[in-house]
Amino acid sequence: MDGVRNLTVSCASSNTCNDTIDDFRNQVYSTLYSMITVVGFFGNGFVLYVLIKTYHEKSAYQVYMINLAVADLLCVCTLPLRVVYYVHKGIWLFGDFLCRLSTYALYVNLYCSIFFMTAMSFFRCIAIVFPVQNINLITHKKAKIVCIAIWIFVILTSSPFLMSTSYKDEKNNTKCFEPPQXNQAKYHVLVLHYVSLFVGFIIPFVIIIVCYTMIILTLLKNSMKKNISSRKKAIGMIIVVTAAFLISFMPYHIQRTIHLHFLHNDTKHCDSVLRMQKSVXITLSLAASNCCFDPLLYFFSGGNFREGLSTFRKHSLSTMTYVPKKKTSLPEKAQEIYKE
């Protein structure tokens, strides 16, 4: 589901279309995956390092961000295999197991990111819109339970992607990351696609739209205008998560739907084949780029990022200093539980 195969297809005029986009594909994938690997590794590695060092604060936000960073790093570690594959012009060198694992890791990361962002948006909505009624829903322990459930759900439901095996082409070169060739396999992939489309994209997207609408309406009220810090954090999260969905997740799921139906057509125009193959390369790269959005989520929605760095640098001094906390109201306590 995530590759671009070197297709020779029958055109409407019954001529053979031998044009390919191999050079375009290899250059785009190798370049963009290399960039995503570097940015994703150092960005998520840095965020994870700071979060672990300041984990004594134990906020729900930290739990979600740690899990996001871990999911990104696991995916980023497999991207160099893809880079080598496309640098070697579509020849797989690492065996069938790593071929399956690389495909699996990309989709586990993709849908873990979507579900973690959705959970963060939902509980941020609870903390802002209903801080008093549902304060027990946004605790550190509840966040852990939600994250464990997401990991188990995504790992199990993404297991069919492990069927994306390597194979030998007509030149006896080992291939990986290519679309299915048998009609039965195409049907199974199409069913899997629609399940992941609705459960893994459409439903989470609807949830975040509803949550962000409620958050924005609440922030526009006079009672919330006093809490400038909360407003900035919520707005930062809305911007980054919405950008991730519109730039990374949405184009990929739309294009994947069109592409899978396109593969079922017996007659394909050469120009359409080439355009479809190019769109696969671009949208799949955008989907992988979600690894770069997650550090931005921490930088821009985490209002206390600099404070976290300061806490990390001076942790030994802060543990020796006692600063009494002021009494807080229930709405403020809800924000404190979900603080960055």
UniProtKB/Swiss-Prot annotation:
Chief localisation class: membrane
Membrane topology classification: Multi-pass membrane protein
InterPro entries: CLT1_recept, Cyst_leuk_rcpt, GPCR_Rhodpsn, GPCR_Rhodpsn_7TM
GO biological process, one term: G protein-coupled receptor signaling pathway
Extracellular side: 1-31, 82-109, 166-196, 255-279
Disulphide bonds in the chain: 99-176
Cytoplasmic compartment residues: 53-60, 131-144, 218-233, 301-340
Annotated protein name in UniProt: Cysteinyl leukotriene receptor 1
GO MF terms held by the record: leukotriene receptor activity; signaling receptor activity
Gene name for this UniProt entry: CYSLTR1
Glycosylation sites: 6, 18, 172, 265
Upper classification of the organism: Eukaryota, Metazoa, Chordata, Craniata, Vertebrata
PANTHER family assigned: CYSTEINYL LEUKOTRIENE RECEPTOR 1 (PTHR24231:SF45), PURINOCEPTOR-RELATED G-PROTEIN COUPLED RECEPTOR (PTHR24231)
Family the entry assigns: Belongs to the G-protein coupled receptor 1 family.
